[in-house]
Amino acid sequence: MSSTHAEIVTITLAQQILKTFDLGGPEMPAYQLVVNARPCAMCFGSIPWSGVRSVVVGASGPQVEKITGFDEGPIHPQWQQELRKRGIEVVEDVLHDEALKVFHRFHDTGQPIYNGRTGD
């Protein structure tokens, strides 16, 4: 399924387990989403709706696209500021090199790269 990205699945499971659509609601702890790379367009859109209060990112989107050939979709150039102005903290470059190694290993497997525009 093209929508089963880690961020979407994680947010969905957390909301199901906690029985709330708002992970930032009253009396909720400050939930944090930790990802190995900048969220793609779809995952980025889900973050403000989720209620998480911070996002921790390993590698940048352009780096991942270069390594893997993924098309991460149109991302606002100031995506970090867009989240921050909605009260969501953004921390970048956490374990940056380690995050890139994961994508290099994926690329080296020769597995197909899903790209909805080409039907691959």
What label would you give each PLM region?
Residues 1-5, 38, 70, 74:
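Residues at secondary-structure transition points
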Residues 1-17:
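Acidic helix/loop or adjacent segment enriched in Glu/Asp that either coordinates divalent metal
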Residues 29, 46-120:
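Zinc-dependent deaminase
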Residues 24-38:
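Immediate flanking context of iron-sulfur cluster ligation sites
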Residues 15-25:
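N-terminal [4Fe-4S]-dependent radical SAM core
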Residues 37, 41-44, 49:
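Conserved redox-active cysteine motifs that mediate thiol-disulfide chemistry
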